[in-house]
């Protein structure tokens, strides 16, 4: 970390609201070095307007699509570099459910470790209910139609369909998770980024943005992700 540098988390909803003000956009552009996204980007090349990046279909963007679209637009207009950690990169370093059991065990049943495990379980169960809800249903909560039951089984259950319904406990069938949040956090550290991440560079108005869709050493990176969390609970 350079002297004076800070990492500040923010939702796209809050950031979009902040950037509505021209004076705040000016302040933001002067103070912020780059913005990390927990999700990917799609590149659009128009012969008239040039190149731009828009949010891809990552689940994180579906909670407030309008806000995500505004954030992407503002950041490119302000020439603030974006680093987008895509689901393709996360899929290269999947974590097994047993990792959370090991985390709780190694931490001697630390309440925060238990909370991490419970949050992972509740999160995947909620996504299961959204994915199995009918197209157009309010239960899907803006989840794209292609994120359906078949997608869920393929992505999280290794394609092994035990014919569970939306009301069944899906947790025993989960083979792995995609560690978006852990991966994005690690990507914030320059030495880790240069060592493990392989971004695609997209230039917009003379500014280089990075879409991270590959990692260089998946198994080594997975070990690092686990070890960082294990170490966090050492006495």
Model segments located where?
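N-terminal acidic, glycine/proline-rich low-complexity segments
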Residues: 1-235
């Amino acid at each position: 970390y350079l002297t004076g540098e800070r990492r500040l988390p923010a939702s796209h909803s809050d950031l979009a609201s902040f950037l509505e003000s021209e004076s705040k956009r000016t302040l933001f552009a002067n103070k912020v070095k780059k913005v990390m996204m927990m999700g990917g980007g799609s590149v659009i090349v128009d012969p008239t307007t040039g190149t731009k990046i828009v949010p891809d279909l990552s689940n994180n963007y579906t909670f407030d699509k309008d806000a995500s679209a505004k954030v992407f637009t503002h950041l490119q207009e302000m020439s603030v570099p974006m680093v987008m950690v895509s689901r393709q990169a996360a899929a290269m370093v999947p974590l097994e459910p047993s990792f959370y059991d090991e985390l709780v065990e190694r931490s001697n049943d630390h309440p925060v470790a238990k909370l991490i495990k419970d949050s992972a379980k509740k999160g995947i169960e909620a996504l299961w209910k959204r994915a199995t809800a009918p197209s157009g249903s309010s239960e899907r909560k803006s989840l794209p139609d292609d994120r359906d039951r078949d997608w869920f089984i393929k992505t999280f259950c290794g394609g092994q369909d035990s014919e569970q319904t939306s009301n069944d406990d899906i947790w025993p069938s989960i083979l792995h998770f995609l560690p978006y949040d852990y991966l994005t956090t690690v990507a914030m550290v320059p030495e880790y980024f240069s060592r493990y991440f392989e971004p695609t560079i997209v230039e917009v108005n003379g500014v280089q943005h990075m879409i991270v869709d590959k990692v260089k050493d998946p198994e080594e990176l997975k070990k690092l992700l686990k070890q960082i969390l294990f170490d966090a609970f050492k006495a």
